[in-house]
């Protein structure tokens, strides 16, 4: 049980070791993820029937952003970090209860792994090690509203950049990691207020540091360490 009084039922393993580079929403980049249950919840009966669903909801904790107290307004990145709006009109991690909600693709349910049942997913917007407090099936007939208004976000995922990733550098990642990495870079991982074409950024992904610049709508990868 954590400080919020909720049981941590599992933790997710993702290619993202730090917050920089994590997609701003789930589904933007289809990076692989692996959900491992905590010991009290490693029961195959708890996931019986889950294999019939293509997507699931993850309810999780912003464990790297927990703080005492809260502010009724925040500065969302979509508005450049300058304009304040109500915290409940955003998906900011700085919330009264510090909980996140993500819909991810469920690739498979593995029942024969040493850690008990393991869920293999794609599209999570979470740092590796993030605690999960609940899992529920995604139901398209109840959970999808294609015509929903998007408020100040405009209802879209934002600009998509062109990615120039030299093949010899991309080859350092396995085939299951490459597409998610390209999508994460195309979504522009930089803070919205940073637009220095000469700056070299570093993004931790799958145990490597991807170094890149951004200029004229193109991400150019200059090194992988």
List where the protein language model places each region.
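Basic/aromatic recognition patch in beta-strand/loop cores that engages polyanionic ligands
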Residues: 196-216
